[in-house]
């Protein structure tokens, strides 16, 4: 493997890869026999250099089998599905094509650390030990372990090791498909395109590739520094690894024209055809009201919007103020909807109002200190968060801008409106300014809805190639880091004696 190559992505095969199933069948055969010893073990005959045979694999993957290698559980049903697709012929055999495929697979698994993954989670130490102990039994174990590991790696590097909602409940973007690519792997083995397939597995985004390069450099630095500096480098490694995982949870393609808010550094960027069209500082949710991760679209802009107060704010903030000052609503021009005879609740006994069953809807009229400012960008989503203007522009001068109840306040709201409405009559500067100067609420539909991604990056690489680390205002990184570090199964123990592939009849034991 070329250690100087960032990402350690598997290169195209240097030896010809297998091109037909018939070529797979040309791998030399080795006799196999079954031996019963508590569990049914597979004692593969001599001639280890020949590798396992199709008969060995059929026996190992017989219905009802439960396979473990050095205590590492293998996914028998998935392996059986894969080997059925290739007529149970070995894939990682000692022939030139099998050796070339093995090199590609091991290069990808070893290079997984530059994607923020852990090679040991894919059995790399166990695989290398088996290469050093070339017995027939070891060859069979290596065949099965490598296939299982490569299928797991393919899912992890393409769609993420973790399910996003398991570590961040307010993740609202559907994650990529996590189905094992059993038939994909079989097809590329037969077609001789394993190297190209491995290259195409990670997310194709430039932001992801930049972080891979940065992580490669951090690993190199960690190998050079002394123990006193190692902790700081390791922390950066963890932070970059967490953000690579977040990239893997995202769609593999963004629309050519889209808007991204990074809640971790409170910035907004509009990108069109690969170019930055607009950048703006924003205010995002505070620690108690974090801005969620979600995709939506700007489908309309509301000028001079009223503010319907969310129930959580009414109960947690307004009700205590009303109990202390019954004129609070009148003083702030907030009315109770559908209560014309007493719009400010001056006759309400607020002390008797239960926070669990608040009976009123409150709305602040447009203008003045309305917290939505002069415009709201309608972005329907299940979290009911949106982008809007603000009457407090001084907040954008603060370094810490995690201050809102979850919605996103945009410093350059007028410029964003002009961009969103470009090509529409309402998007002409003079028309927009007239709408803003009016005290009347108006709604303009957007002809070309703008996709909006509210995301969360605490590590990114800028256009000059510099790694930029951000604070973690919502303390989200730690849970992702813990999940990534967790071993998906039992770590294979060192090979100290004859290792076996064990086969347990159905019902003899379970593994969850």
Regions found by a protein language model. Give the residues of each.
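Bacterial N-terminal signal peptides
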Residues: 31-42
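Well-ordered beta-sheet/strand-loop patches within structured domains
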Residues: 46-78, 82-84, 144, 148-152, ...
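Cationic-aromatic interfacial patches
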Residues: 49-174
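Exposed, low-complexity/repetitive linear segments and helix-based recognition motifs
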Residues: 14, 27, 46-47, 140
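N-terminal secretory signal peptides that target proteins for export/translocation
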Residues: 1-26
């Amino acid at each position: 493997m070329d250690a100087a190559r960032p990402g350690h992505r598997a290169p195209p095969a240097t030896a010809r890869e297998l091109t037909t199933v018939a070529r797979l069948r040309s791998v030399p055969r080795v006799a196999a026999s079954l031996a019963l010893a508590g569990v049914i073990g597979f004692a593969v005959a001599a001639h280890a250099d020949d590798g396992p045979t199709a008969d060995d694999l059929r026996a190992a993957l017989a219905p009802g089998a439960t396979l473990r290698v050095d205590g590492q559980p293998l996914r028998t049903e998935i392996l059986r599905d894969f080997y059925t697709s290739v007529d149970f012929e070995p894939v990682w055999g000692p022939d030139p094509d099998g050796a070339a495929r093995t090199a590609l697979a091991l290069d990808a698994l070893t290079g997984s650390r530059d994607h923020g993954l852990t090679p040991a989670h894919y059995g790399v130490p166990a695989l290398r030990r088996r290469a050093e102990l070339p017995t027939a039994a070891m060859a069979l174990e290596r065949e099965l372990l490598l296939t299982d590991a490569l299928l797991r790696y393919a899912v992890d590097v393409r769609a993420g090791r973790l399910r996003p909602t398991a570590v961040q409940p307010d993740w609202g973007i559907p994650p990529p498909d996590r189905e094992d690519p059993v038939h994909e792997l079989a097809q590329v083995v037969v077609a001789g395109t394993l190297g190209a397939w491995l290259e195409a597995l990670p997310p194709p985004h430039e932001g992801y590739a930049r972080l891979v390069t940065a992580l490669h450099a951090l690993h190199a630095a960690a190998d050079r520094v002394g123990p006193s500096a190692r902790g700081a480098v390791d922390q950066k490694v963890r932070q970059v690894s967490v953000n690579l995982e977040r990239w893997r949870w995202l769609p593999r393609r963004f629309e050519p024209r889209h808007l991204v808010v990074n809640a971790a550094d409170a910035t907004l960027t509009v990108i069109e055809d690969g170019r930055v069209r607009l950048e703006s500082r924003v205010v995002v949710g505070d620690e108690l009201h974090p801005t969620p991760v979600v995709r939506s679209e700007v489908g309309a802009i509301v000028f001079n919007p009223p503010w319907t107060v969310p129930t959580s704010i009414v109960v947690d903030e307004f009700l205590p103020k009303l109990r202390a000052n019954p004129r609070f609503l009148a003083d702030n021009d907030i009315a109770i909807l559908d209560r014309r005879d007493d719009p400010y609740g001056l006759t309400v006994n607020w002390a008797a109002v239960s926070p669990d069953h608040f009976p009123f809807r409150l709305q602040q009229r447009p203008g003045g200190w309305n917290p939505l400012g002069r415009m709201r960008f309608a972005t329907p989503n299940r979290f009911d968060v949106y982008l809007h203007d603000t009457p407090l522009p001084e907040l954008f001068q603060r370094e810490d801008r995690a201050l809102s109840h979850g919605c996103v306040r945009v410093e350059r709201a007028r410029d964003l409106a002009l961009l969103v409405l470009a090509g529409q009559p309402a998007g002409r500067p003079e028309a927009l300014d007239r709408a803003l100067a009016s005290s009347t609420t108006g709604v303009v539909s957007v002809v070309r809805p703008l996709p909006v991604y509210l995301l969360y990056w605490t590590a990114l690489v800028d256009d000059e190639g510099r790694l930029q680390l951000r604070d973690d205002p919502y303390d989200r990184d730690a849970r992702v880091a813990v999940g990534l570090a967790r071993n998906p199964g039992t770590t294979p123990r060192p090979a100290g004696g004859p290792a076996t592939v064990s086969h347990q009849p159905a019902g003899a034991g379970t593994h969850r």
